[in-house]
UniProtKB/Swiss-Prot annotation:
The gene is murD. ATP binds at G112, S113, V114, G115, K116, S117, T118. It comes from Thermosipho africanus (strain TCF52B). The keyword Ribonucleoprotein does not apply. Keywords: ATP-binding, Cell cycle, Cell division, Cell shape, Cell wall biogenesis/degradation, Cytoplasm, Ligase, Nucleotide-binding, Peptidoglycan synthesis. Its EC number is 6.3.2.9. This is UDP-N-acetylmuramoylalanine--D-glutamate ligase. Pathway: Cell wall biogenesis; peptidoglycan biosynthesis. InterPro entries: Mur-like_cat_sf (IPR036565), Mur_ligase_C (IPR004101), Mur_ligase_C_dom_sf (IPR036615), Mur_ligase_cen (IPR013221), MurD (IPR005762). The keyword Cytoplasm applies. It holds the Pfam family MurD_N.
Amino acid sequence: MKYTLLGFGISNKEILKYLLKKGERVFVSEGKKLSEVDKEFLNSFGVDFEENGHTEKVLDSDVILVSPGIHFENDIIKKAKENNIKIDTEISFCLKEFEKINWFPYVIAVTGSVGKSTTVSMIQHVLNKYKRTLLAGNIGIPIAKLLNDDLRADYLVLEVSSFQLFWSDKFKPNISSILNIYPNHLNWHPEMSHYINSKFKITLSQDENDFFVYNPNDEYIVKNLGKVKAKKVPFKYDFEIHQLPEHLRYKQTIENVAAAKTIVEVAGFEFNIDFLEDFEKLPHRMEYVTEINGVKFFNDSKATNAAAVIRAVENFDGKLHLIMAGIGKNEDYTLLRKVLKNSVKTVALVGPIAKDVKPYLDGINFMECSSINEAVNQLFRIANPGDVIMLSPGGASFDAFKNFEERGEYFKQLVFQLKEGKS
């Protein structure tokens, strides 16, 4: 059998390693320029490849494995469908391969606009106290890596994105969950209904023996419950924020904990809030950096859409100086404007997102800066003791950084440099 890997990101790299181990023929087609390291790797295994675009060479294959970010209206995808070539994705491909090696884990899959990584990490953290549990998916651990490293466990927790779900038609987790739905990725999805339908594909193949755990406070989710065949279980909000460990006492964490708690209980285990005492918060998500002259700094670089920014901003009571940066996602910022008007002293805009957000900042004090470095320094000059300066960008990082992690680390480095100069 011959496979084409359409896109050569982190997931397809792991799939390539797996297919080569099996002795399959593989062709790699990357829309952008490949790095020299990637070319060396492909050449060392004698793998044919193309870069800077997808040609009809892609069609000389039995199966095309699509990277999540490939747009569904890509011309080569249309031609592949016309030629009846099987199109598959990492999720469904890997789950079928698990069956071939007689591994049948209990699968828990979580999606949502914000909070996915924190929630799946909490689920794994608690389940590991009972059973061996692996975590993979959109959190940065390719599912195919589990195959390559021959990792097995009783439970498999997956974080899945709308892109991954769009391409996955036969995905049947034992428990699926949608945390929330906010307008997001509308630069990829043509309209909101398309985005919602992609999210709900997480439960499309489930039946009455499976479970769908959902947020009862999200109107987009509640309106679409009729299409769910699995047993429907709403989040349990049976705890107070003050009961959470101190490092988790943020408003958005309530939803994460409610989801994780309900899912763990549906899986048949007790979820004690005390289990989170040793849960390590993920970096770049409401991450406290340091305090300088009474001004606190927070790194929320993972906030790449308006909904995530809103959830972060709501934790502060009018003493916030906010840095927004990066590339916007074709969003409506009306709700963000209302929250900013009540909660921030200053908004510093950096990069392409400035032109998207500026029209919504009437009556809000804002400044445009050429870099995050300039924004940090300008805001620190005007901040008073008791104020907070937070990077919560609201946009993708690709205008200036490789990913949100690199952006967050850069911000923290700037803050510590500032502290050294002030100490």
